[in-house]
Amino acid sequence: VVIPPVNDNLDSTMQAIYKNYFVDFTPFKSEPTCATKLGEIPASWSVCKFCDLCDLLNGRAYSQEELLDSGKYRVLRVGNFFTKNSWYYSDMELEDNKYCYPDDLLFCWSASFGLYIWNDVKTIYHYHIWKIDFSKTAPYYREYIFLYLKQELNKLSKEGHGSVMAHLTKSGVENLDIVSPPEEIIKQFHNSIIPFIEHKKLVEKEVQQLTELRESILSKMVS
C-alpha cells in the first residue's frame, strides 16, 4: 500500500509555513532586524547551536544473535520506515532512552536519511537512528526542529548524496547554527503546525491498517 499524495501535500504546506515564519520572517516584518552569521533576523531573536535546543540520543547496536523473530519489543531499523512488514524483535529490558514512544521525533542518519514522528507503540530503535530529546527546551519545539532539519536535509540533498554523508555526523548536526526565536513564537508556530501533524498521523495509521489487512488476506489465499 502506497502512502497517498495527501501526505506530500501536508509536508509541502508545513514547509511553506516554516519558510514564511523562519526564512522570510513575514509575520515579523514590522520588527527591527539585526545582522547575524545566518543573515538578517528579527532583533529580538538570536542564533545558537542546535545542541542548545535539543539533544541527539543514539540508539543501540545489535548483533544478529540478539535480533529475534518474535519477542516483547520490536526493533526499529532504518529499513522499517520503508518496508514496515519485516521486523526483528527483542526481549531485552533497556534504559528508557533506548526506546521510542508515540510522538517522538526520529532522525535516520545512515544510508537512507529522513525525519519521522513515531506513530506507534513503545519500540526499541536501532543505532542508525537518533531520537531527538527536548529536555533542554520543551516538547512544543518538536515541530520547529522537525521542519528545520527537513530544510537542512533538502539543502544537502541538492549538493548530492556525498555532501549529506559528509555533514550528517552527530557532532556536525549538534554544531549547526540555528535561529532561536522567542519561546512565544515557537508556541505559536507549534499551534499552526500541529493540525497538519495530526492529520498526517491519521493517514499513516490508515495506511498501516490497510497494509496489515492486505498481508492477512494474501496469507490466507496462499494457505
Please provide the spans of the model-predicted regions.
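Flexible, active-site-adjacent loop/turn segments at secondary-structure boundaries
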Residues: 20-26, 36-39, 60, 73, ...
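Sequence-specific dsDNA recognition surfaces
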Residues: 34-35, 48-66, 71-104, 125, ...
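Short conserved micro-motifs at the rims of enzyme active sites and ligand-binding pockets
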Residues: 87-88, 119, 190
